């Protein structure tokens, strides 16, 4: 199994979102061991993974298997989002990715899953995160679906 970790300067939040969608399609089987878990159980598992921010000015995005099992790697909102989007893809659960910010600038990502015909906030970034709730009142808020990011494929 390849250990793929993207490390680069931040270009844009759209590029980060694109990479989450790309890695979801490439590595969703990394979370096959979660197949028997309910969405709520997966939320709790991901929430309880220690948060570790990326180094300043560098964006790390690790494949889920490494985010889950290697404690020395950065594990921030985009890494936790990727674990959950991989689970959603594995289970056939529709998902989107939200980008938020406490002011007019984006700085946080999290998944939104369609459960029982309702879109549910699935932000498991921090230990105090609660399924279905924002971790802060966003000023900046934008939702992406994979089809929104086709320009990065050209």
Say what each PLM segment does.
Residues 1-154:
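A structural boundary/capping signal
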């Amino acid at each position: 199994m390849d250990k793929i970790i993207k490390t680069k300067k931040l270009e844009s939040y759209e590029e980060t979102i694109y990479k989450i969608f790309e890695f979801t399609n490439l590595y969703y089987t990394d979370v096959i061991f979660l197949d028997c878990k309910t969405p709520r159980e997966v939320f709790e598992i991901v929430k309880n993974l220690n948060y570790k921010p990326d180094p300043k000015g560098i964006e790390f995005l690790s494949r889920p298997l490494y985010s889950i099992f290697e404690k020395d790697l950065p594990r921030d909102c985009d890494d936790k989002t990727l674990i959950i989007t991989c689970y959603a893809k594995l289970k056939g659960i529709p998902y989107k990715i939200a980008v938020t910010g406490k002011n007019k600038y984006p700085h946080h990502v999290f998944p939104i899953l369609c459960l029982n015909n309702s879109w549910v906030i699935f932000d498991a970034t921090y230990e105090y995160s609660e399924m279905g709730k924002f971790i802060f009142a966003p000023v900046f808020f934008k939702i992406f679906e994979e089809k929104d990011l086709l320009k990065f494929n050209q």
